Amino acid sequence: MTNAKFVDVTQHTSFMTFEQQEENPKLERPKLQKFLADAGLCSRRAGESWIEEGKVTVNGTVARLGERVSPLDDVVKVNGKVVRAQLPKLVTIAINKPKGYTCSNHDEFADRLIFELLPNRLLQTRLFCAGRLDVESEGLVIVTNDGSLAHRLTHPSQQIRKKYQLEIKQPLAGEHIPLMTQGIEDEGEFLRIDEIRAKSKSPVGETRLDIILGHGKKREIRRVFGHFRYQIKKLRRVSIGGLHLNKLPLGSFRELDQKEIDLLLPR
């Protein structure tokens, strides 16, 4: 082995939820000889020879030819030295999702997927959504290959505030506001709106509202307003944490720098 680099793979991992791993085939389980070749140690054929000769172990067990490994979870060694997993460069992107796009990497029933809005150069590493919008909604969605960031953005304990612009057909009744902010039960799940605002001093009687959530369960705004028989004309997410859509056109994207990523997270 010439110029081979070894390092403890656990120093290069990012936490990913099961759902994110399921939606991220790029971090699937490649065959061991491919993993070795991708790490720059050898050709696939040479890797096969090393495996057959018993030089390779996976999690302390002598490897078998054709065995698959997880680059993030398994510890692979060649002649007792840990192999560095060649993880992709971390990328985080803001997308202004139009209505009609599904926030998923694969969905056989979806007409269009959000990743179709990105150029091929950004799809060389498999991205996943760090929080979703339903197909009928539009606005700010964060996609990334950074599992640790995605976990922080989606974990309920973070309470990251998200702002939505909501348009309903019927004027908002004043008696419904405290009920929405106190919370309701729907399909055995507790749902609530953190804040309801309007451009006027009071949201009562308004049809265009600003909604604030510090959590965000599946279709939560639609379910809460639907509970009170409101019909939703439009729902748009305009900010996550301190990051705003600003002038990002509908259907467009922007790669985020570290300062913008930091805006997403609570201080």
Which role does the model predict for each range below?
Residues 3, 9, 15-267:
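Basic, flexible Lys/Arg- and Gly-enriched helix-loop patches that mediate nucleic-acid binding at interfaces
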